[in-house]
Amino acid sequence: MNNQKNLLQAATEYIEANRIIAHHLLHYLSSMERQFLLRSEILDAFKELCDKDCPELCDSPLASIINCCQEAAMDTSWIYLALRPRIASWLFVRIHLESLQSEIITVAEFLQFKERLAAGTSDEDWVLEFDLAPFSREFYKLHEANSIGRGVEFLNRRLSSKLFEELGKGDKRLLAFLQVHRYRDLQLMLNENIEDVHDLRSSLRQADSFLQSEPQDKSWEDVYLDLRSYGFEPGWGNDVARIRNTMHLLLDILEAPSPNNLEDFLSRIPMIFSLAILSPHGYFGQADVLGRPDTGGQVVYILDQIRALEKEMRDRLLQQGLNIEPQIVVLTRLIPEAEGTTCNERLEPIVGTHNARILRVPFRNPDGEVIPHWISRFEIWPYLERFAIEGERELLAELSGRPDLIIGNYSDGNLVASLMSQRLGITQCNIAHALEKTKYLYSDLFWPDNEAQYHFSNQFTADLIAMNTADFIITSTYQEIAGTKESAGQYESYSLFSMPGLYRVVHGIDVHDPKFNIVSPGADPEVYFSYADKARRLTHLLPEIEELVFDQKLFDDRRGVLTEPDKPILFTMARMDHIKNITGLVEWYANNTTLRNEANLLIVSGHINPDLSSDAEERKQIQRMHSLMDQHQLDGQLRWLGVHLEKALAGELYRFIADRKGAFVQPALFEAFGLTVIEAMSSGLPTFATCFGGPLEIIEDGISGFHIDPTHGDSAADLMAEFFLKCREQDGYWEQISNGGLDRVEARYTWKKYAERMMTLSRIYGFWKYVSHLEREETQRYLQMFYGLQFRPRAQAMAE
């Protein structure tokens, strides 16, 4: 805070000493005749003024203010600035345009000013303010920006010392936690013979003395009766060596808890036997669904996640000596009009797993009738409460009891997870995948403009409730939480915002909350592997791929014939929507002669016939694709496939393009993570991807791929053209970037690492929730009221 005040003090003193220059700057900004200015617009205007009239401004204290300014709002008298001097730290200032008087203001005052400008009316007398700050004053929070997203490490450090103090006073919460574990009728860990911490220490010593003389590979079953007499039940390990190691970890914790020992010990406790994963919207299935509206990376993510989690759960249970089959159920929507998919089947086993399945429950209208057709993710809010109630009943029957962990996905799944977890009293994990608020400019401030199509008033309210209800939140990248030095994170954008006429958020989500953890996913290693791994290649698919890419015949699901098939291929695959920016890529390609000469463009996206799409935005993008291909005569250089590729075929397609020394491009305006980026890199395909979102962290620019700025398409096209030129002229360059991508994925982005971390996190948060009362009951009551008075009426109104 002192640094922030020093920053403002220096600027104030500069203004006083250089009033003409300061007035020139403010006049220049106000002359743009814009009530709201984005960071990029402010920086561009400042640079333009410095270059043209005021070079002395470049190194002035005002430059420091401008460089950390995220947005500005102004009327004829005042300019209000939102400053972000460092990551997740905000300061609000207003400056009078004539007198140059400046002062620090509150977040509420800043938001109120924006509301007045947006609504074009005078200030409302009373506005509902959403403020969770009073509920978190005494709760542990991170302070350093580099600690954000490492919540469990922070919790372990802070709370392990607290646990040590409480154990010294005879506290029994750790003991009670160890005694509470059961699997149906099977008692685990400790029995009634151990009554207090003193008994626990004594029993651990006796058991260790007994086990010391036993063969280290002797199984749990062979020593069970002896250990039971000391007070121990199954769950300590599958053989003597592991049992002793687990007991030693607990003895160390009882002696002096350390964060690492605590994490190692908790990661072994048999707490997670069943999972519920919630993903209501879209066509959730295993075949013929990818590329359909609202159906893409999230489905792939969850199916790969399930296979990795089930394997990790099975391995951990076996290591702890328990012959228990874990259960994972994905709860999604049943769609009677399934369009040839399995989405009309109530139960569907998940391929590649032992005991995971998809459970589908229909949406119903207020009269109880089943909704038969697909519904956009933006239109499903009226159905979620009833879906949560019916889904909970079906889930409990399917699992023969409560799940041990519930994982929500996207805004709808996270809201349903919140409703269920509160009723069932189980640990809740949220995964956003994408937060719509940051995708659409001023989507909060001008929410009425988008309400008919997107219903953001419901979605942003659901996000606020679910974020603050969750026990822990996992993200794929740091910037998903807290952005970069230059821009705010997706979650950070929910810390303060306003929806005029509804409510004003002055303290929404706090990115310094230890509930945030970065756990990056990977690509399915059975499907996405290096093109150079010849023994595993699916060569029987190559004729089908060659036909898809090069066949001269045209069908209803493809357009364009590549007249120079020997050229390398620039490949992209994504949904056909505005944010994915497929048509933007086509325009870049069309306008870059060098790129067109060096490479063909292959696009797998959407439908060729717009009449086949049920999504208005997709139809609009399809029509634009046809217009661009006609306008720029691209049919000989661009191949557009409106097909849905199964995973095995998609994996081999990546490798086929790598064989031909091609590249992959992900041109999205914003990408929360970038699963296709991981898939391409895992296949050894050099990758270009947007600098907005997850790919900025995934790719090391120039080493394991390349960043492109989708707002500067000409530069992006030039970069891709330069790459293909360099590959043609410099031996080994293509292989250098290809290997860099493979190395990066192996080091950071695998499902094995993901599953290990996810299972450890679920245990640690479950433990701290039990022993430290992390339920935040006061906050939950506040959120329940907000749900009942704000979300519920608006959702119900949609159904009328």
Spans of features found by a protein language model:
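Catalytic cores of nucleotide-sugar-dependent glycosyltransferases that transfer UDP/GDP/TDP-activated
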Residues: 1-800
